[in-house]
Amino acid sequence: MALNGEYAHVAFDELRAPLNKGKWRSDVFKADAAMPLDVEVGTGNGTYFAHHAKTHSDRLLVGLELKYKPLIQSIRRAVNAGCKNAAITRFHAFNIDHLFAEGEIDNVYIHFPDPWTSPKKPKNRFVCKENLELLFRLQKPGSFINFKTDSLVYFLWAMDEIRQSPYKIIFETQDLHNSDMKDQNFETAFEKIFLREGIKINFVRLQKI
């Protein structure tokens, strides 16, 4: 497996990844302790993952992805782009506190997670009050979370959860591509599909004050 072979130095399975907790900068990236460390929850095929790593070479990036094929696609894109600041792990985001120590991470990106729209499935949604409280402890003050989804049902539900969390809402829209944030936005592969189908993109930015 590439997780323990070709990409072993930048791709970690469920057993190896927690060993980096509190030590991602020093042990994985050999970077200065002050260098920002961002996290993408659910990298998909890695278009945003590689873009972020390449355009923000002054920041580190760790991706979380459960599915093996997109995980490898993601790290391969970053490596092929010459990025030395990206790593990825096959790990369930609900257990993200097993990967990072309190105050270890900076910005968090959550793009188009499964909306779990079945009436019995909201408990599986990652953006919820409990996980936001968890992320709040892991992030440095001043850091933000970007959350994008095509599902208005999930977005409205998540906004209720967000308002019960410690985060401050910096920007919120139900139509990202007709908002003041459109020029700052990078379109993911899923996003391009949704836009072609005429689906509006919901977006919120939260900040740890």
Curated annotation (Swiss-Prot):
Active site: 114
Pfam families: Methyltransf_4 (PF02390)
One GO molecular-function entry: tRNA (guanine(46)-N7)-methyltransferase activity
Domain of life, per lineage: Bacteria
Binding, substrate: 150, 188-191
Catalytic activity: guanosine(46) in tRNA + S-adenosyl-L-methionine = N(7)-methylguanosine(46) in tRNA + S-adenosyl-L-homocysteine
Pathway named in the protein's UniProt entry: tRNA modification; N(7)-methylguanine-tRNA biosynthesis
One Gene Ontology cellular component: tRNA methyltransferase complex
Keywords of the record: Methyltransferase, S-adenosyl-L-methionine, Transferase, tRNA processing
SUPFAM superfamilies, A to Z: S-adenosyl-L-methionine-dependent methyltransferases (SSF53335)
InterPro entries: SAM-dependent_MTases_sf, tRNA_(Gua-N-7)_MeTrfase_Trmb, tRNA_methyltr_TrmB_bact
The enzyme's E.C. designation: 2.1.1.33
Record-listed S-adenosyl-L-methionine binding positions: 40, 65, 114
Family recorded in the similarity comment: Belongs to the class I-like SAM-binding methyltransferase superfamily. TrmB family.
NCBIfam families: PRK00121.2-2
Function: Catalyzes the formation of N(7)-methylguanine at position 46 (m7G46) in tRNA.
Stated name of the protein: tRNA (guanine-N(7)-)-methyltransferase
Protein's gene: trmB
